[in-house]
From Swiss-Prot, chains A, B:
GO terms for biological process: RNA repair; tRNA 3'-terminal CCA addition. Mg(2+) binds at residues 53, 55, 106. The keyword tRNA processing applies. Catalyzes the addition and repair of the essential 3'-terminal CCA sequence in tRNAs without using a nucleic acid template. Adds these three nucleotides in the order of C, C, and A to the tRNA nucleotide-73, using CTP and ATP as substrates and producing inorganic pyrophosphate. tRNA 3'-terminal CCA addition is required both for tRNA processing and repair. Also involved in tRNA surveillance by mediating tandem CCA addition to generate a CCACCA at the 3' terminus of unstable tRNAs. While stable tRNAs receive only 3'-terminal CCA, unstable tRNAs are marked with CCACCA and rapidly degraded. HAMAP family: CCA_arch. It holds the Pfam family CAA_C. Keywords: ATP-binding, Magnesium, Metal-binding, Nucleotide-binding, Nucleotidyltransferase, RNA repair, RNA-binding, Transferase, tRNA processing. Its EC number is 2.7.7.72. It catalyses: a tRNA precursor + 2 CTP + ATP = a tRNA with a 3' CCA end + 3 diphosphate; a tRNA with a 3' CCA end + 2 CTP + ATP = a tRNA with a 3' CCACCA end + 3 diphosphate. This is CCA-adding enzyme. Transmembrane segments: none annotated. The lineage of its organism: Archaea, Thermoproteota, Thermoprotei, Sulfolobales, Sulfolobaceae. InterPro entries: CAA_C (IPR048833), CCA-adding_arc (IPR008229), CCA_tRNA_nucleotrans_2 (IPR042090), NT_2-5OAS_ClassI-CCAase (IPR006116), NT_sf (IPR043519), NuclTrfase_I-like_C (IPR011068), Polymerase_NTP_transf_dom (IPR002934), tRNA_NucTransf2 (IPR015329). It comes from the Archaea.
Length: 412, 412
């Protein structure tokens, strides 16, 4: 069975666990006397081997407020670990990342609230998620979560970050709790048609997103609010195809791909000067991708596909057009001969004629007909960056090959 | 006054009239004892100087039928003029063209019917048209018709033949009879919005054409049924512009035009082997122009304009595209992820991906992406022809220059 094979790879051993416990011992000592708890997939037992961060939350009374967390609490934590290898990171508010023996530990200050629906910052809900999941998943259930996570990683729909807009770990856990096991989740997902409602609890709000999983610990929140329709659709199709023809390729796509350049492909290589938060950079990259596509279409190009990939500093945007030569001039459709506006049209236009339909037509010059210029103009990054751009001739780059091939290897 | 100047040029002198009368004397002798009459603009006194054919109709009792006209009557006429310079021509049925001193005389066999609405062939109505016009137009009215004819010739909307799809001589006469004079026709035409109804008599049928002038001698027929909307619109616009700013340019467009090539312009030069009737050839040319435009659009080209010009043997079709490079591949939009048809789509397509909207997309190869091939394939001529085609670089050809400029010189 494929799934057993996969579990052998992804299920942590006792040794893996001990390694992480050893790291945690160091952190526990440092946070002595603080109100802290281990959260996240390690605590819930749904983590993947060699593929996890450890989340340690430090709680403060809710009355201290957000600003206390961001200054005093953070400073206290930093003082306790400053001799270790650490960096500062930002989500809704700042937290500390400590690296010990190549294990990443996120130390997150949070407010202690009475229940999930009383959360003041997004992270305050986390201990309630932990409680909900640990009390609803048995040992087999944890492995089912692991399979689902790895499957979603394999097909590229795992990760709540803006860059992915995929499923969070918590979402995979809720799916397993709701449907029972990995196979059952796939069976149901293969039949999805949005809006999809998965109600472990009654929603306390009307949600408009395509996939709706009201949070059992805070039912006015949709756990999968940020999952894109593209990822929902991809997951549904992958589920259908996996059930028909299970293969390790879904979990660990490995095939090297090759494809020729079809149409005209513009490659934009961006190099960001400053280090910014991933979600901030990718928010801007996603906006840029949309703007580039919209602008090119507006200028008359037929766009096949625009995609972006990369990390937080080196980003590639690929723009695929049916043709980069759309011509300098375009047909301009004017008013009917009996319209009040014909004199204005005739005055403002050149190359005017009357069509068989009684309308006036003219030829107009495009304001811009160089796709490269249009694409570059529509990159909206708030940090400084260098850009290198070229029309693709041929390539060895596997990422570009994937962009050209498009079809996922697990599909065909 | 412009119009007086124009009349000086177009109004025949006594000498012109005598010249034609001399030609007619020869024809009258030849048709001795037949029931013949002079019809057409010469008879009606609405002909233009150095710009007329003479129509002579030979009438037979209506009981002899169409076939008698086409054989016996025609042969009799030919026998009488066979020593002169003559050719055979075809409209609804055959007639004889005799050339005497560079004056063209059309000798047309027709059936003698009691009234216009009893016409068996289209030409049987003609003597009733002649009677109607001569009894409704005075001398000044005839000059007004001449002005209107010359104006329509100048702007290219005169001529009932399929090649032009413009106004017939009879239509111009009815317009003057209805509105009173040339200026009044223009004033009204400048305000036209189709459907336009000009009722010298109550229509005996519901007409669907944009311009409706029920024939006073046969009210179930629309005199302007064959006038294209393009010509109606052109006439309306020209009327409006002439009234604002009268100029000889409307009557005798003379300006040499120049224009650069905008977009990609394909020139197709057709040379027809056989001599065919103009209306038959131009029916096929018009169909070809439409087919070329439709096919190019269907294959994904953005068509600016397709036009044809020439005579009955040498015809030019010009095809203007925004760009001839539309690329070998195109974006193919597939079904939503939840559709029954996705498996079929995935099986039949390559380069498949899921879009942000949850749809499947793929890249497809165009069956044809060479505009020249598509244009040539869509020429539907039933006679043999040679074709020469090329992408326009630059030209001295005034017809091509006019095609490139488009804007009529009288407009701007």
């Amino acid at each position: 069975m494929i799934e057993e094979e996969v579990l052998k790879i992804i299920k942590p051993t006792e040794e893996d666990k001990k390694g992480i416990e050893k790291v945690l011992e160091i952190i526990r000592e440092r946070l002595n006397k603080l109100d802290f708890e281990v959260e996240g997939s390690f605590r819930k037992g749904t983590w993947l081997r060699q593929d996890t961060d450890i989340d340690v939350f430090v709680f403060y009374p809710k009355d201290v407020g957000k600003e206390y967390l961001e200054r005093n609490a953070l400073n206290d934590i930093i003082n306790r670990i400053k001799d270790l290898d650490y960096t500062l990171a930002y989500a809704e508010h700042p937290y500390v990342i400590v690296n010990i023996n190549n294990v990443e530990v996120d130390i997150v200050p949070a407010l202690r609230v009475e229940s999930g629906d009383k959360a003041i910052t997004a992270v305050d809900r986390t201990p309630f998620h932990t409680k909900y999941v640990t009390s609803h998943l048995d040992e087999r259930g944890k492995d089912e979560v692991r399979l689902l996570k790895r499957f979603m990683k394999g097909i590229g729909v795992y990760g709540a970050e803006l860059k992915v807009q995929g499923f969070s770990g918590y979402a995979t856990e809720l799916l397993i709790i709701y449907y029972g096991n990995f196979r059952k989740v796939l069976e149901e997902a293969s039949k999805w048609k949005h809006p999809i409602k998965i109600e472990l609890t009654k929603p306390m709000k009307i949600f408009s997103e395509p996939l709706i999983i009201p949070d059992p610990v805070d039912p006015k929140r949709n756990v999968t609010a940020a999952v894109s329709l593209k990822n929902i659709a991809t997951f549904s199709i992958a589920a259908k195809y996996y059930l028909k023809n299970p293969s390790i390729e879904f979990f660990f796509p490995s095939k090297k791909v090759e494809e020729k350049v079809k149409g005209d492909v513009l490659i934009l290589r961006l190099n960001l000067d400053e280090k910014s938060s991933e979600d901030i950079v990718w928010g801007q990259i996603k906006r840029s991708v949309n703007k580039i596509e919209r602008a090119l279409k507006q200028y008359g190009f037929r766009v096949i596909d625009v995609q972006a990939w990369g990390d937080t500093n080196n980003i590639t945007i690929a723009v695929q057009l049916e043709s980069k030569n759309i011509g300098q001039y375009y047909l301009n459709i004017g008013p009917q001969y009996y319209s009040q506006t014909i004199e204005d049209f005739i005055q403002k236009n050149d190359n005017i004629w009357v069509g068989e339909d009684g309308r006036l037509y003219s030829i107009k010059e495009r304001k811009e007909y160089d796709a490269e210029t249009i694409a570059k103009k529509n990159i909206v990054l708030k940090v400084k960056y260098n850009i290198e751009s070229y029309w693709l001739q041929n390539t060895e780059d596997q990422q570009i090959m994937k962009f050209l091939r498009k079809t996922p290897t697990w599909l065909k």
